[in-house]
């Protein structure tokens, strides 16, 4: 989906949860390949999280690939979806309290799985939204936009996106970093011996 002829949003199949939904291993790998291609080329990552159990032990390999191999953590916003299932979105105090707990949990799980530096912990971007509050549907919310803005907390995601762009040096720098990640993906796919290929990338292309 293109927005204002400048931004293209790509909703990928995701990297996790295939075992529950799909039993065809070839199809699972195809889905993952599609996702990995788009992710490696992305300027910013909106990482959608399950509100009840955001990050699992089984995610470790893919988290390492995303945030260590491709170095995408600084360009990632973690989005806790369907937060109206976890908090009273009409109660600011309850929302803030539960969001704080979830954010701390996400930081801890990431640290357990991929060992975050202090700088990464401080720079971790997490928001919690309710894209369809109370399940009332698009038609209703299009007629009640002001209420939607308040309850959905979509503005927190918009603000986090703008902040990420600034933190990463603006649009042009982000585009260059995305090219590096895409090249890493291509190179590692062609030369899958991980440690050696990483060494070659660092020595020859400064990535």
Regions found by a protein language model. Name each.
Residues 1-167:
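Globular "head" domains of long coiled-coil molecular machines
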Residues 145-207:
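Extended helical scaffolds that flank P-loop GTPase cores
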């Amino acid at each position: 989906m293109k927005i204002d002829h400048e931004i293209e949003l790509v909703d990928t199949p995701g990297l996790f949860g295939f075992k529950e939904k799909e039993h065809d291993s070839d199809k699972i790998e195809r889905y993952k390949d599609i996702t990995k291609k788009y992710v490696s080329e992305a300027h910013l990552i909106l990482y959608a999280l399950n509100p009840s159990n955001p990050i699992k032990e089984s995610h470790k390999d893919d988290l390492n690939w995303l945030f260590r191999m491709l170095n995408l953590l600084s360009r990632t916003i973690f989005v806790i979806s369907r937060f109206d299932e976890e908090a009273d979105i009409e109660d600011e105090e309850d929302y803030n309290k539960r969001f704080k707990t979830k954010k701390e949990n996400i930081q801890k799980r990431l640290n357990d799985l991929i060992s975050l530096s202090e700088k990464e912990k401080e720079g971790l971007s997490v928001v919690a939204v309710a894209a369809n509050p109370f399940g009332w549907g698009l038609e209703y919310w299009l007629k009640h936009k002001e209420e939607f803005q308040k309850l959905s907390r979509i503005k927190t995601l918009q603000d986090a996106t703008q902040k990420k762009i600034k933190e990463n040096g603006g649009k042009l720098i982000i585009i260059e970093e995305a090219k590096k990640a895409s090249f890493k993906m291509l190179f590692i796919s062609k030369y899958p011996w991980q440690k050696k290929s990483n060494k070659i990338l660092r020595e020859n292309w400064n990535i």
